[in-house]
Amino acid sequence: HSERPLHRMYEQWHSLGIVGVISAFNFPVAVWAWNAFIAAIAGDTVIWKPSSSVPLTAIAVQNICNEVMEKNGYTGIFSVVIGNGSTIGERLINDPNIPLVSFTGSCNMGKHVSKTIAGRFGKTFKQLF
């Protein structure tokens, strides 16, 4: 809907393939859900790297969401990777097969994430604190 007369606006969603989500310890499920469900609606799969302080929460949420998706005919949409943040995070932001990475974390790490992803012409969403 446009406020200008005779003006039309269109929104198109295109699948990117794989979306990476790196979330912090605070609100890990909310941050992941904001990104993951939009990506799933667009036809993407999601790899989630939660904070190492909330692994059980991440695994439980991922299992519940995958169960719901599978009951509706969609398999393998959400994956969670638990482990050392710098090792796994570096793999996600350097992987050219992951065109979009959403990052929540410190400003210093956000700069590093931005530079790395920009170097491979990827896209990033950041929520910095």
Describe the predicted segments one by one.
Residues 1-129:
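Rossmann-like NAD(P) dinucleotide-binding subdomain of oxidoreductase/dehydrogenase enzymes
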